Amino acid sequence: MADAIDDIVDVVVSTAPDVRDGLTGRRVYEADENPSGERQLEADVYADELLEARLLDVDAVGSYASEERESVIEADEGGRYHVAADPLDGSSNLKSNNTMGTLFGVYEEPLPAAGDALVAAGYVLYGPITTLITARDGTVTESVIDEDGTRTVVTDDLTLPSDPVVYGFGGRVPNWTPAFADYVESVASELKLRYGGAMIGDVNQVLTYGGVFGYPGLEDRPEGKLRLLFEGHPIAAIVEAAGGASSDGDGSLLKKEPEQLHERTPLFVGNDEYIERLEAALP
């Protein structure tokens, strides 16, 4: 299993410089929307097509699914693992030249799969430098990806700081439920606001400084915005492996199994104390 997972991660790593280099000139919208009803940038489609072609070329990969596609794409030869990806998380930040990333989860069951079928997860963060966070076998590792696609481990056992510093929550404030708004008010009196509009960037702040990030169920969208398979499970696996917690407001995201490929979920991750307080605050 180890070699096969390494092969999958290596493809994501080697693709990262191509995704980053390809952002220039792809800041305009396509005519189409993705399956979640969001407008697609040319950069979304470009990153998705690169990952699909390269991951399905790995012998161990049996299928590929992404936030940008309606259905699962099967490999010609059935491999053991199934990859779910958000090829360009935070792509709406491209116009303003802010943080984006590539998020992926490796499952050992056909998609859509339950959180306990996830065997590895990770994300590439396109910031001032390009970094990779991976979670596997209960350990989180941080690496730097160079322009030629090589990676160098900089932290081999990343854990959440025990003294939380930052918080960030998505969704329009007028659409927050009263219970969630009250919770945020208490958090805001203790932590510093850090919210950049790309989940990967905001979660990376939490991993670096400790704290809490979430995108809640809203008054007009109780199911939330983020996708369980493409975003919820992988981010939950990373934060939990780093010693934190995840929740949909009721329990760990890794205990949830989507019935549909693009199923949405409220999402909260961070230090245990803030996730416990969140679950106690929500009805």
From Swiss-Prot:
SUPFAM superfamilies: Carbohydrate phosphatase (SSF56655). One of its GO terms (molecular function) is magnesium ion binding. The keyword Hydrolase applies. InterPro entries: FBPase_C_dom, FBPase_class-1, FBPase_N, FBPtase, Fructose_bisphosphatase_AS. Mg(2+) 1 binds at residues 67, 86, 88. Binds 2 magnesium ions per subunit. Its EC number is 3.1.3.11. It is found in: Cytoplasm. Keywords: Carbohydrate metabolism, Cytoplasm, Hydrolase, Magnesium, Metal-binding. Pathway: Carbohydrate biosynthesis; gluconeogenesis. It catalyses: beta-D-fructose 1,6-bisphosphate + H2O = beta-D-fructose 6-phosphate + phosphate. GO terms for cellular component: cytoplasm. Substrate binds at residues 89-92, 195, 225. Mg(2+) 2 binds at residues 86, 89, 231. Its cofactor is Mg(2+). One of its GO terms (biological process) is fructose 6-phosphate metabolic process. Homotetramer. NCBIfam families: PRK09293.3-2, PRK09293.3-3. Belongs to the FBPase class 1 family. This is Fructose-1,6-bisphosphatase class 1. It comes from Natronomonas pharaonis (strain ATCC 35678 / DSM 2160 / CIP 103997 / JCM 8858 / NBRC 14720 / NCIMB 2260 / Gabara).
